[in-house]
């Protein structure tokens, strides 16, 4: 049997970090993942997927990711339930991350937000404005 989930998306808000009574760090965040198709209005919809990460990786997520950061998650789907304050049973489905990959530099998130607001940024990307001729490549 196989339970594996692989996601790439952007954080909807800054990650949260808590500790269990035993001192284990637990990080949580929500990832917005675009669907591969468009709706009737021609717009792409997204799924908002809750992710849980533990120990040192939870600290790293808190320190290096923020709202809008692009991240890759490799983990497993898990369901759990609890009774809320009104005594009703609540079911939760989330991804428990085995690995979280930071897919862009930490400060790049702020640059992306500024670019989307109509401001352009000139970065130190060595691949910007390359004038290479690749026509002689065999593929």
UniProtKB/Swiss-Prot annotation:
Pfam families per UniProt: SSB
Residue ranges constituting the SSB domain according to the UniProt record: 1-104
Signal peptide positions (record): none
Biased composition (Acidic residues): 129-139
Domain of life of the organism encoding this protein: Bacteria
SUPFAM superfamilies the record matches: Nucleic acid-binding proteins
InterPro entries xrefs: NA-bd_OB-fold, Primosome_PriB/ssb, ssDNA-bd
Transmembrane portions of the chain: none
Gene3D superfamilies reported for this sequence: Nucleic acid-binding proteins
Keywords annotated in UniProt: DNA-binding
Sequence segments annotated as region (Disordered): 103-139
One of the GO biological process terms: DNA replication
GO molecular function, one term: single-stranded DNA binding
Gene Ontology, cellular component aspect: nucleoid
Annotated CDD domains: SSB_OBF (cd04496)
Biased composition (Low complexity): 106-125
Assembly mode: Homotetramer.
Name by which UniProt lists this protein: Single-stranded DNA-binding protein 2
Organism lineage: Bacteria, Bacillati, Bacillota, Bacilli, Bacillales
Chain's gene name: ssb-p
